[in-house]
Design a protein with these regions (language model features):
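Gram-negative outer-membrane beta-barrel transporters
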Residues: 370-371, 432, 436, 444, ...
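C-terminal beta-signal and adjacent terminal beta-strands/loops
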Residues: 4, 515, 679-686, 705-759
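Short acidic/polar hinge/loop motifs at secondary-structure boundaries
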Residues: 126, 135, 142-169
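Transmembrane beta-barrel wall of Gram-negative outer-membrane proteins
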Residues: 196, 203-232, 237-285, 312-334, ...
Length: 759
């Protein structure tokens, strides 16, 4: 019989302090990625994405090995894992809160709910609105990204994950990613690791209500788990409703002492109002309101931006996922085979300038991972390899947005994509203190688009800019063919070094290449719309002006060379721990998705040369038996390099400094209190010309939890304690106006409470 346990952020050599508000807050802020990375495919644990995940003993590694810290220390790059026990206890759990303790991962909330926050790591995918590329997002080691690399971030639900793996930069190459940003892997719980049942009810301000739960069972040779999460909210702003339903199940089987298998399935349904941006002055006066579009008087235009009240932008999306993972261990050889299929529906009602985009299609994924570990005492496999192939197709239809209703079709496309990624790498020990890790990755991608619209013209509509509720005569423009066939190939070599002068400290350095092809969203964009007219109609009052409704830029793949170095360690007593990484990237052909002063799409372009410099710093400390804290600091200086138009300006949308800190007090055995702050102390550029900026802000939250019994606890929190008015994010444009609607207000002060019961 194999014993199974939850992979926990504890080890015999690194004590942890049980903190109920933040969960188990390890003295090392980032508990070994390895605890999940290299153990996750063990039959008793969930599905890590990393190869070699079962190279360690299949008995209880987390309890018997005592070297979990060493697993993390061996990695020559930025990586972390956040267990569900480490999430802040919250009535409104979001990705930004779940990952608040991880430096280098910048999450900017858009509308406060389960919608489309901007997630960027090291600036990859930074300038998409919304961000839909730049990071490989995985569920149990299989991508929720579509075959072209795009993803819907709202499907990522931290409440449905037992842990989240974070691989920053090239450390994600072993997973099949070659992008600059890296990868996030949401790992499901299993019946072996989490037997019994759990139920969490929560609610609070802005109509927030939710219920989540799971039930798991584990026997000697098999296990199973079912989970669900339902949430909804009215939202902070006037037009701000959102809801999400997620369900999932997995079944594991110990076929033999050498073979384990797991089958899993999940479904997510997401819907949210797009409350849209506000001009800064309007946001400061009343952040709850939504915008009614530009003011036009005597031929002049003030406050350019979308008319949210009339157009009622919204997104409704669903995704079904089914997959399997099979692991075979033959002495020092480990083989891992994964197969997956996703079917995605996405109905995105943009403002009139882009119309309604409906996309529906499926994607198949196949992954083969191999690890060779002849030395059982080694932490990492001597050799590891991954091959991943994703292929998919989708139908895409474009319709006019007529005051929030679906109008005539003006575009129809059949989209196909395929991506092959291959990775191979060594971890070569040079004595007891030094490891050299050379690796090579290759990626080949195909993007095909067949324009099947079939009509000679594309319809257009418009409204009177001076009275935007009054429709103008309909029009039509010639239907230019938008078909294309593009292919991209690139190599991504890397070389990493680690040096361990003591058992508690590690220094590392690495140089790597990254390669990121454009997605269909980059290659096919609606253009020539305005806040009062549809694509192809740049002048609302002139329906006869011939202008293309789509742009299909011939884009190059984005590539970069990155050097990074870091130092992580802890004091001998374990009261202080740190993890710091600095990196510099020379980026070529950075993919930028541009918008004009009204927020209308201009399509994607390649920047010539850009530079990304950053520092990722995490620290954790235990001051007394009852007081502890942690800090996650991210510095980002992303700039154009000798650009003929933008010079050496900062890339819009990237906060230069982001500090997230938390303090925890264990007031008694059953009662804990905590406080946290999210502080952006510097202005953030809204446009690439650096003429408009979002102001600095600080948001303070308070939390508390009380354990009524061993199985029941209650919790409460106050978010944005001082009711600050601030922009949690912005639109990103190339050239802004001072009065432009570009600012997305963060939630005001809110109160949440909940009850958690285990059975």
């Amino acid at each position: 019989m194999i014993t199974h346990r939850r992979v926990c952020l504890k080890s015999a050599t690194r004590p942890s302090v049980a903190l109920s508000v933040f969960g188990t807050l390890s003295l090392r802020l980032f508990c070994s990625t390895a605890a999940v990375v290299f153990l996750g495919s063990e039959s008793g644990n969930a599905q890590s994405a990393a190869p070699g995940a079962t190279v360690l003993d299949t008995i209880v590694v987390s309890a018997l090995r005592g070297d979990l810290q060493e697993l993390l220390d061996e990695l020559a790059g930025g990586a972390a894992v956040v267990s569900a026990a480490e999430y802040p206890v919250s009535g409104h759990m979001t990705v930004s809160r779940a990952l608040a303790a991880v430096p280098g991962v910048v999450v900017q909330d858009f509308f406060g709910g389960n919608d489309q926050p901007r997630i960027q790591i090291r600036g990859s995918g930074l300038q998409q609105n919304p961000v839909e590329r730049g990071v490989l997002v995985l569920q149990d080691g299989l991508p929720i990204n579509r075959a072209d690399g795009s993803y819907i971030v709202g499907f990522a639900n931290p409440r449905q994950a037992d842990a989240i793996e974070v691989f920053r930069g090239y450390t994600a190459n072993r997973l099949g990613a070659t992008v600059l940003g890296g990868a996030l892997n949401f790992i499901s719980a299993t019946g072996w690791a989490d037997p019994g049942a759990e139920l969490v009810a929560r609610g609070g301000s802005f109509g927030q209500a939710g219920l989540s739960g799971q039930v798991g069972y584990g026997a000697d040779r098999y296990d199973g788990l079912f989970r669900f999460d339902v949430s909804r909210r009215d939202g902070f702003r006037d037009y701000n409703e959102s809801s999400r339903v997620s369900v999932g199940a997995n079944v594991g089987l110990q076929v033999s002492d050498r073979v384990t298998a797991r089958i899993f399935a999940g479904y997510a349904d997401l819907g949210f109002d797009v409350a849209g941006p506000l001009p800064k002055s309007v946001m400061e006066a009343d952040p709850r309101q939504v915008f009614t579009g530009p003011r036009v008087s005597m031929g002049s235009v003030q406050f350019p931006g979308p008319n949210v009240v009339r157009d009622r932008p919204r997104r409704d999306a669903s995704q079904f996922l089914v997959g399997s993972r099979t692991t075979v261990e033959l002495d020092e050889h480990t083989f891992d085979v994964a197969l997956g299929y996703t079917y995605t529906k996405d109905n995105f009602r943009f403002p009139i300038s882009s119309g309604i985009r409906h996309t529906e299609g499926g994607d198949f994924t196949g992954v083969l991972r191999y690890a060779f570990k002849p030395d059982e005492t080694a932490t990492l496999p001597l050799f590891e390899a991954t091959a991943q192939y994703v292929v998919g197709s989708a139908s895409r239809d474009y319709f006019l947005n007529q005051q929030g209703e679906q109008g005539a079709r003006f575009g129809q496309n059949a989209l196909d994509a395929a991506t092959l990624s291959v990775h191979a790498g060594f971890n070569l020990p040079l004595g007891a203190q030094v490891t050299v890790s050379p690796a090579i990755s290759f990626s080949h991608s195909v993007r095909d688009n067949d324009d099947v619209y079939g009509e000679a013209t594309r319809p257009t509509i418009a409204y009177n800019p001076a009275n935007p509720s009054i429709a103008l005569p309909n029009g039509a423009v010639p239907a230019e063919n938008t078909s294309y066939s593009r292919s991209y190939s690139g190599w991504a070599p890397s070389l990493g070094f680690t040096y361990r002068p003591t058992e508690t400290q590690t220094l590392f350095a690495a140089v790597s290449r990254s390669f990121e092809p454009p997605t269909h969203d980059d290659l096919l964009a609606t253009v020539n719309g305005t806040p009062n007219s549809s694509p192809g109609r740049p002048n609302p009052g002139n329906p006869g002006t011939a202008a293309p409704a789509f742009r299909t830029p011939d884009l190059d793949a984005q590539s970069a060379t990155t050097v990074e170095a870091g130092w992580r360690g802890r004091t001998g007593a374990g009261h202080l721990s740190w993890d710091v990484v600095a990196y510099y990237s020379w980026v070529n052909n950075e993919l930028l998705s541009l918008r004009d002063v009204t927020g209308a799409s201009l399509g994607a372009v390649n920047a010539d040369d850009t530079r990304h410099f950053g520092v990722e710093l995490g620290m954790g400390a235990t001051f007394t038996d009852w007081l502890s804290g942690r800090i996650a600091y991210t510095f980002q200086d992303f700039r154009f390099h000798d650009d003929p138009v933008r010079g050496s300006n900062r890339l819009a949308g990237a906060p230069r400094h982001l500090l997230q800190a938390a303090l925890q007090v264990q007031a008694s055995e059953n009662w804990s209190l905590g406080a946290s702050i999210r502080w952006v102390p510097d202005r953030t550029p809204v446009d690439n010309m650096n003429t408009l900026f979002a102001d600095p802000y600080a948001v303070v939250d308070l939390r508390s939890e009380y354990r009524i019994s061993d199985t029941v606890s209650v919790f409460g929190e106050v978010t944005n304690l001082f009711d600050a008015t601030y922009a949690s994010s912005t639109l990103i444009v190339d050239q802004a106006r001072p009065d432009q609607a570009a600012f997305l207000p963060g939630d005001g002060r809110a109160f949440y409470a909940g009850l958690k019961a285990t059975f």
